Amino acid sequence: MARKWMRLLIASLAVILLAGCSSLEEQTIDGLENAKVAFQDDAEKPNEKVNDMNIFLPSGFSIEEESDETNIILSKGKDSFILFINPNELPSSQLYYDLMTSDSNLEVLDEKTFEQNGRFGFAAIIENSEEKYELITSIGGIKLTTISEQQDIANNLENMMLIVRSISTN
């Protein structure tokens, strides 16, 4: 009888552990959908200021001191995020998307483009190493990148698009 309970307990724990670990495919699908929703929703109200620019930073994000006007380094815990701002590009610009898709050295696992109200945006997941992925979110001349672990892809893409969406350059 004790053996049956032990097997049931082990089987239950295995199911719980497996359910808690999302696959790369699930993280990718959820992350791209999260980025799409963040792109289409109203921009978050800015809660930080960098130079002359207002920006929304989700909880836990901070601005690093060595940032300048066009390259802003953000951090959340041990993760770094680099925000590139090209003020010469309009919100409809596809510059960063075209650069990514023309680079044959990149192994793009999945990407999705978005268009709304004269804005062009995209989110992409690029293989960086066996267990790390480069994430990109962009709208026009604003691009945010990070290196992410698999289990953080969906959450990072959502937060990244919320940040990018909150910035107005033109």
PLM features: what roles do these ranges have?
Residues 2-9:
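Bacterial N-terminal signal peptides that target proteins for export
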Residues 50-97:
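Secretory pathway targeting signatures of secreted, lumenal, and periplasmic proteins
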Residues 103-151:
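Signature of long, low-cysteine stretches enriched in small and polar/charged residues
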